[in-house]
Amino acid sequence: MKLLALAVLLLAVCSLEGAFVRRQAEEPNLQSLVAQYFQTMTDYGKDLLEKAKGPELQAQAKAYFEKTQEQLTPLVKKAGTDLINFLSNFMDLRTQPATQ
């Protein structure tokens, strides 16, 4: 019985001591968190830059932009023509009542 009580007492003391030590542990302050964040972002940026230097990625990007340009050029031309026609109709409507 005494051994059981001693074991429980020892467990309680160790548990309290562990909680006390955790409270005394230094909490990371805001400055160190921001510094760590910027360091991580810098490392990520460097890795991304190294990957972007590869000719394969550049070729893929060039092909993507060329394909996009091929698809968008007719749409932009049509939109420009439609806009000019639309504005021309408004100008014609304004000039007709003035001439009558």
UniProtKB/Swiss-Prot annotation:
It comes from the Eukaryota. The keyword Transport applies. SUPFAM superfamilies: Apolipoprotein A-II. GO terms for molecular function: cholesterol transfer activity; high-density lipoprotein particle binding; lipid binding. It holds the Pfam family ApoA-II. One of its GO terms (biological process) is cholesterol homeostasis. It is found in: Secreted. Plasma. Its main location: secreted. The keyword Signal applies. GO terms for cellular component: spherical high-density lipoprotein particle. Residues 1-18 form the signal peptide. Keywords: Cleavage on pair of basic residues, HDL, Lipid transport, Secreted, Signal, Transport. Coiled coil: none annotated. Monomer. Interacts with NAXE and NDRG1. May stabilize HDL (high density lipoprotein) structure by its association with lipids, and affect the HDL metabolism. Belongs to the apolipoprotein A2 family. This is Apolipoprotein A-II. It comes from Leptonychotes weddellii (Weddell seal).
